[in-house]
């Protein structure tokens, strides 16, 4: 799974064709059977409106939806090891959490190992059981999550953990409200036909309430 799914997916082919190609190449199954398996994969990664999304192109999907497709491609042939290279960096914070939960759930469900590459210690702490710390391309510490965060041995690891703790505790949340948003909606029209009539909407944001305090 790559950092930027938009550049990893082919904009000239539908999601169905791209996942089917992997299944047919490696499993030697028919196109109809591949499509059936593709639908199952997309359900497993939490993509909604499968019959519609499977016929979509990558540019018609949101960042989170594209990353779900990439995860579906990653698990398509039942790997023992899934490599995820900064898979949430290009996503907003809310979608990041959803994708992380999805990856963790799939790891347990499919009983596979995950090599998760990240520079974000918060993400690593949420996901990993065992951690390798690298500096200048060399592994300087290899230990359990508990030891890395609560008993680091290498000086570089200590600096990373201390910096993370300072950043987390650097500012106290204030009581002053600096932004409030109520029932925010961002809908994109779906146009079809020669006259490009609006036949529906993609609800990117639907009735979101947000309050932001000083230092938050």
Describe the predicted segments one by one:
Residues 76-80:
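A short, proline-enriched helix->beta-strand linker immediately N-terminal to the Walker B motif
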Residues 97-110, 122:
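Helical segment within the ABC ATPase nucleotide-binding domain
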